[in-house]
Amino acid sequence: MAPIQSHQSDRSPVATRPLLEVRNISCNYELERAVFDLSLTVNRGEQVCLLGPSGCGKTTVLRAIAGFHPVLTGGIFINDQQVSAVDVMVPPEARRVGMVFQDHALFPHLSVQKNIASGLHQVSARDRKEAVADMLERMGLTRHAKRYPHELSGGQQQRVALARALAPRPLLLLMDEPFSNLDQELRERMGQEVSDMLKENDITCVMVTHDQNDAFALGDKVGVMEDGAIVQWDTPYNLYHRPQNHFVADFIGSGVFLEGALYSVNGVTTALGDLSSETALDWIVGSQVEVLIRPDDVIYDPQGPVKAQVIRRAFKGAEIMYTLRTSSQITLLALFPSHANFEIGDEVSVRLEVDHLVAFPKESIPE
């Protein structure tokens, strides 16, 4: 299957410049400030995600990029053209962006092929027919061309929405919680399929989601948002292993915080033993800190120094997530292979093996 001939496939010196620049924008939502002095840059062919809880401002940012929401300060540039500012508002249809909405927003009275064609404007009937046929084939929808949205599965509706957004060959694809209405198994499969398709065709994409699994499946870079600001813009790996603040550490993945004190520039002593860091920590020796312990940092070891009781378990197929509690009432989360099968009430021995030590000053931890 040949790649989609996107407008951004040329790797000339101009094509190496950022496709999207958001510069210090602020936005209101229902008269309240929703986005504060936010900036981000997306290179051509890059897929990025804005990740955060409901109400953090991520959808407002996406709508501002699409041209559906004004900015109060700053500016937005697409392909070096300013499309948003206090006194600039290029309409959505003139921005050459494709949009996939949370509910897919398919026209219920139109067939699949007519839904896809609805995104094509100012093209000849012949070109429209060829573009629709091409997208039907690429999305595996050819045999569903004459069906209506209510006759399709959730995954098929998702493909139709994506085909409609990509048919005009936009410069930039925007997706708002595109997998939220799918069941877990389907959303994981669709997330990987969409990611592969975007990378294969060198399509630049910005997605917003509250689900870290969706963000990690798609995003080359992910921006974690809190209260209208990006608090960390990084790779999925660094967000998980090197969170820059307590909010990111708490929001990304599972884990618990263990109290400790610095005994050296790269070592922390805790009630469950000493932990060391590959690099120097930022605080003076003796500082009180909270150390992030991920489930994969807790290793099952029959000879381990830490004894704990199983108080909860969640079977996940190849693995089981255990909640453990020590005699000193310290709670840990542990992810063990499922053949290490323990029941609630069993005592297990574990050791801590922290590859990336993440610690924050105790006074910075919110109650």
Give, region by region, the residue ranges found by the protein language model.
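Non-catalytic connector elements of ABC transporters
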Residues: 2-8, 255, 265-367
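A short, flexible loop at the N-terminus of ABC-type nucleotide-binding domains that lies
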Residues: 12-22, 27-37, 86-90
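Conserved coupling/switch loops of ABC nucleotide-binding domains, chiefly the family-specific signature
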Residues: 72-75, 227
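The feature captures the beta-strand-to-loop junction immediately N-terminal to the Walker
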Residues: 51-53
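ABC ATPase nucleotide-binding domains
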Residues: 96-98, 102, 106-247
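Helix-to-loop junction immediately C-terminal to a conserved catalytic motif
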Residues: 66
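ABC ATPase NBD Q-loop/coupling interface
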Residues: 75-95
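Short beta-strand immediately N-terminal to the Walker A/P-loop
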Residues: 48-49, 99
